[in-house]
């Protein structure tokens, strides 16, 4: 992990998402904050490369294996946690399997937003993850347009050393 204090950043880009009251507000805020943090750990160059790959190829297939590994690890951890809390092993397996059905392995940020397909930031409510993912389709152009304009004034070296400055709100 890079030390991201006192580094060159672009001017702030704000992107607003729609929150639906059917979702847990704390979980929605957590997932959005994790997406923001992930974006702000990208250089302009990394963002551009990841976006180009996503536009050209869609979701990267290697991201599926990373997500599956994260889900398996979380399932094992959940079974252990429930077993240690006093459940039988069989009951813990059943409860953990039910819990896992509600969870998605989270890219931070989503691949559509320039995320690395191998970077999984944990699990979270899959309905919220799906909502955020679908909203990116209509919001990523805001970021792309500003980065494209900024690119004109940055050298390649500057793009490799200047970080995003994105604020995700709802």
Task: Give the predicted meaning of each segment.
Residues 1-105, 109-170:
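Nuclease and nuclease-like effector domains acting on nucleic acids or nucleotide cofactors
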């Amino acid at each position: 992990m890079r030390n991201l204090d006192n580094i060159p950043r672009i001017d702030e880009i704000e992107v607003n998402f729609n929150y639906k009251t059917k979702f847990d507000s704390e979980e929605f805020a957590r997932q959005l904050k994790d997406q923001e943090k992930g974006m702000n750990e990208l250089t302009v160059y990394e963002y551009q490369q990841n976006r180009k790959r996503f536009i050209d190829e869609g979701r990267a297939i290697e991201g599926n294996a990373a997500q599956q590994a994260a889900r398996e690890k979380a399932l094992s951890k959940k079974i252990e946690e429930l077993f240690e809390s006093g459940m039988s092993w069989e009951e813990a397996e059943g409860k953990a399997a039910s819990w896992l059905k509600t969870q998605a392995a989270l890219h931070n940020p989503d691949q559509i937003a320039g995320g690395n397909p191998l970077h999984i930031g944990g699990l979270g409510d899959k309905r919220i993850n799906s909502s955020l993912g679908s909203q990116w389709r209509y919001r990523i152009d805001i970021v792309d347009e500003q980065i494209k304009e900024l690119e004109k004034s940055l050298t390649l070296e500057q793009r490799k050393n200047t970080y995003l400055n994105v604020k995700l709100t709802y």
